[in-house]
Amino acid sequence: MSNIHEHKILILDFGSQYTQLIARRIREIGVYCELWAWDVSEEQIREFAPNGIILAGGPESVTAENSPRAPEYVFNAGVPVLGICYGMQTMSEQLGGKVIQGVGEGEFGYAQVEVQTESALFKAIEDAVSETGKPLLDVWMSHGDKVSAIPEGFVAVAKTETCPFAAMANEDKQFYGVQFHPEVTHTRQGKRMLEHFALEICGCPANWKPSSIIEDAIERLKEQIGDDEVILGLSGGVDSSVVAMLLHRAIGDKLTCVFVDNGLLRLNEAQQVMDMFGDHFGLNIVHVDAENRFLDAMAGEAEPEAKRKIIGRVFVEIFDEESKKCVNAKWLAQGTIYPDVIESAGSATGKAHCIKSHHNVGGLPDDMAMGLVEPLRELFKDEVRKIGLELGLPYDMLYRHPFPGPGLGVRVLGEVKKEYCDLLRLADAIFIEELHKADLYNKVSQAFTVFLPVRSVGVMGDGRKYDWVVSLRAVETIDFMTAHWAHLPYDFLGRVSNRIINEVDGISRVVYDISGKPPATIEWE
């Protein structure tokens, strides 16, 4: 088996919103990469031994005092370097060029760059041709500052009307800088540029693919675990499901999955999990029916964060109880993925912003004397899904819309009761079913129903009814950081509303949430 980690790219993060996207694009090309904070040490870079280094973008100004800089060793490591946006600016400034602060003439959004001279990075790519026969590229810009003088040994490769150095290169040292963002889809030839850098300039083979990742993960799991037993909290979500399948391939019956039914799942979800993993795939699953325990613990609590903490605490208690029954289990498996690792990493100097501390199963008891197994910790979510498909998990399960960890606990507004959860489950199932039937499910990023703790007067036949209200929510988004409400057809919404009111006894009114993010969040709680 080839070593899929032998050839790799190091990406240094200066705080750009696009940095993880760069890493995902490099992985899509078939090359392993890791994303580290910009203030990494020379020793760490030497130990990692990358075939190439990418300096990512960032929000700060190179002209500002104490702004982030690439480690000097980056330019002495003898490997190709690609600077993107801020990365190009700090490369230029650190190697003797000049950067000037933007004063009202930055470039944001679509731009067209004209390629001035041949470069390995731009080899045989163009979107159009200028009147003078020069290649033109459609790119995405997001910068205020700009390079005003390039370092000695560099040539200007591309320009725009307002940016004389939209790209630069030192072909002898294989140093390249681009002021635009090749990682975003708006830069039409961006993927080919990154392919040129990773595959041709850095010489990495394209061997990072699902089948190779699975083979590597199974070998490493066997080596790590040996003949020991492992326990896994299986939720039925993407991450824990893929972990379960990998471990089952690696160690078979030495894996015990604990599935906790908290009474806050979607319609028939608990049975679907048991049918798929227990009956179909033959995994060893302990099914804990804990609906009453969770609902009793949340009784009288209406505050969202308090509900989340209660749900988390009760889960930990139950998982601890079940793990003690698995007396031979030496390892705890978790579905930690690479973005979790990145967000927890922080920065040596404190300059890089640490978004949150992360632990996949938060608050597990300190006396749980087990080793940790995290087979997905190198992978992005899209990679986890592709691996799941390769392992035989169904597409609909891997690509369904996100579902919050606390489940219906945060989709029933206010106090959570069994009656409310049962009504919400039925209404939500109708909404999702109709989205599938209308071929709309995969055209929205997330869709769900929310139970509102208010009653409304309705008319059924000759009688009046005073029943509950639900809200439908559907959004379109790329990254879930911002979102637009989905403009679903009126006749579709009418059909869903009619079905819910007629088929779910206890709901008298259906509304549609037309709030964007911001100012609203996607979930109501």
Curated annotation (Swiss-Prot):
Domain of life: Bacteria
One protein family per Pfam: GATase
One annotated Gene Ontology cellular component of this protein: cytosol
GO terms assigned for molecular function: ATP binding; GMP synthase activity
Annotated ranges, domain GMPS ATP-PPase: 208-400
Secreted found in the keyword field: no
Catalytic EC class: ligase
Positions bound to ATP: S235, G236, G237, V238, D239, S240, S241
Pathway listed: Purine metabolism; GMP biosynthesis; GMP from XMP (L-Gln route): step 1/1
Keywords: ATP-binding, Glutamine amidotransferase, GMP biosynthesis, Ligase, Nucleotide-binding, Purine biosynthesis
Catalysed conversion reaction: XMP + L-glutamine + ATP + H2O = GMP + L-glutamate + AMP + diphosphate + 2 H(+)
Domain Glutamine amidotransferase type-1: 8-207
InterPro entries: Class_I_gatase-like, GATASE, GMP_synth_C, GMP_synth_GATase, GMP_synthase, GMPS_ATP_PPase_dom, NAD/GMP_synthase, Rossmann-like_a/b/a_fold
Annotated catalytic residues: C85, H181, E183
EC number: 6.3.5.2
Subunit structure: Homodimer.
Biological role stated in the UniProt entry: Catalyzes the synthesis of GMP from XMP.
Listed name of the protein: GMP synthase [glutamine-hydrolyzing]
